[in-house]
Amino acid sequence: MNIKQIESWQQPSLDRYNRGEIDWKQLAEATDWPKRWPNYRQYEPVLAVARKAKALVVALNARVETIRQVVRSGGIEHLPLKARQELPGEMLLPDPLYEKLLSLQLMVHASAAPERLRPMIEAQIARDEAMAQTLSAFTKSESGQNRRMLVLCGAGHVAYGQGVPTRVRRRLPGVRDRIVLLSESGEVRLSPQELAQARPIEITHEQVREIKQPVADYLCVKPLASKPSPPSPECGRK
């Protein structure tokens, strides 16, 4: 199980969890998870399932300070050498189709403005490249041989096969993947601070038509928490 919600440099702590040397609470303390991923508690049952299944958990994300520095520096090419060395040397830039999609999606951030959008797009791509590199490296490693990989990340990193999938395919020609998107559950509650940082956006079918591929291979639709729940989610292939 590969997760975005922990940064790859923290893998040694996650390895201790994988070996059963520490529990979930100790893992959260070792990785400073509450500060680095505020809604980290939502992933306790996910890691519990992985432990029960004896599945290795791999941290995918780039260092959050480095990604923020991409934005603050004005883009990848303006990063200090030390920060640039933390990111993959080869990146798919420019990436016109994905960049157009990101220019629509990233407007959800209240701070997004046309003059600030380019560094935000490059920060997203830098994160995607870092996650794709970590995932590809683990797949090629002795520990990753003959394993099926489950990747848990936000929809914006995988929708329409853009983001992480296309970058993994570039590194692993012939790799087979399936993308599953989950509907909103209604269970997540944003804080006043998070609500203040966001704004409503609408992306139309016409705006994404030129991508010419489905948003995912499968959609898993779960009834909202405020409504009576049937026995199981309804999942279907697109």
Q: Across the structure, where does each feature detected by a protein language model lie?
A:
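C-terminal regions of proteins
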Residues: 139, 143, 147, 157-238
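Context-gated lysine
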Residues: 4, 25, 35, 52-54, ...
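Solvent-exposed loop/turn segments at secondary-structure junctions
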Residues: 3-8, 63-67, 155-159, 184-187
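Beta-strand elements within well-structured catalytic alpha/beta cores of enzymes
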Residues: 50, 148-152
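A structural signal for short, well-ordered beta-strand segments and their strand-loop junctions
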Residues: 1-2, 56-61, 151-152, 179-181
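Short amphipathic alpha-helical interaction segments
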Residues: 123, 127, 153-160
